[in-house]
């Protein structure tokens, strides 16, 4: 009871500080949500944008009501009962609000475990919301996929623009929504014209943008899932007005992170594909697809 009340009190204070930060400083917020792929997509977007902009983000999965505000101010989460640590955070936040905020873009991950939680992020007013997928993950408190879709699309109500992975979000949930689409092998705003895989060395992608422009880029991200990450990052960068040269440079900096399609050297000259971090069925299938296409020699 005390823990819950204390957390709610802190959340209210932090959220009010974020609102003040937004009112005092001009910076963009990109929020990433979805049933699967949030963290990988967030990191791909952040790495891409960092090539030409000052970007703040968090490497892990700070994505709930308490931790999301911490990302904007650059803090790690202390223990809920560490009163002095929280006091220092609140004081530091006030100083940042009054001073110079040294970032152009904040890339945030927002998550939900139950209906109604996404509405708690309305105060962020994202400039761009990225929906990675609507899938049957974390279903404990959802009646079905329709309920998941309704929840994951809530940010569309309070975001300036919405970017959706068309491959992994059923069309029936997107009817009538003003959105920007990205996907593989589909007619949508951002899509792949060609994809050439180089085994475990990466792949070459030719990307078509919303304005019809095309460009090619060599990336180390693997398989179709890796291509989706790159496509999402390219779409976000383009929507934020970054020039093509900056987009390509940023996309080339995307690297597999620990536990997510990471290539490791094993014993006796063997190679491992490490996709063990909180792997969903979709992620496991994607990793197996890469494995099956790899030359055993």
Task: Please identify what each model-predicted range represents.
Residues 31, 56-57, 105-109, 163, ...:
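Short catalytic-loop micro-motif centered on adjacent basic/acidic residues
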Residues 140, 257, 276-297:
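Active-site beta-alpha connecting loops in nucleotide-dependent enzymes
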Residues 15-25, 50-150, 246:
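ATP-dependent carboxylate-amine ligase catalytic core
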Residues 1-33, 40-52, 66, 73, ...:
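Short, basic phosphate-binding NTP loop
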Residues 25-27, 102, 123, 127-271, ...:
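Acidic, Mg2+-coordinating active-site environments of NTP-dependent enzymes
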Residues 117-120, 170, 286-290:
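A short acidic, amphipathic alpha-helical/loop segment
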